[in-house]
């Protein structure tokens, strides 16, 4: 069974990762030495706890973004994703099929002037079977 990590350990590990991400890795012993060099940690026990949590977070960061930690590389990647513009606009198609409700919404948003809209009746959803037997 694991132990609960204190606020001090978590905060220190996050700050260390944000500032010294390039010097850290997945190895506890190297992370321990880096923590020892860059921070004034009062006890050996606390240093080991921080280094252990740094190692844990580094493994999580490799799998994907971690909440509460902003790293320059991840920030740039997020910017690229947010600023993505498709090659061909969805509005440049010859005919855009929409249902009557969507047509009304487009009219309210001042897109009613689109000439290539074609109103079609929506297809009825799938026929789900009613449950049999006692409920």
UniProtKB/Swiss-Prot annotation:
GO terms for molecular function: RNA binding; structural constituent of ribosome. GO terms for biological process: cytoplasmic translation; erythrocyte homeostasis; ribosomal small subunit biogenesis; rRNA processing; translation; translational initiation. Gene3D superfamilies: Ribosomal protein S17e-like. The modification Phosphoserine is found at residue 113. Its main location: cytoplasm. PROSITE patterns: RIBOSOMAL_S17E (PS00712). This is Small ribosomal subunit protein eS17. It comes from Homo sapiens (Human). The lineage of its organism: Eukaryota, Metazoa, Chordata, Craniata, Vertebrata. The gene is RPS17.
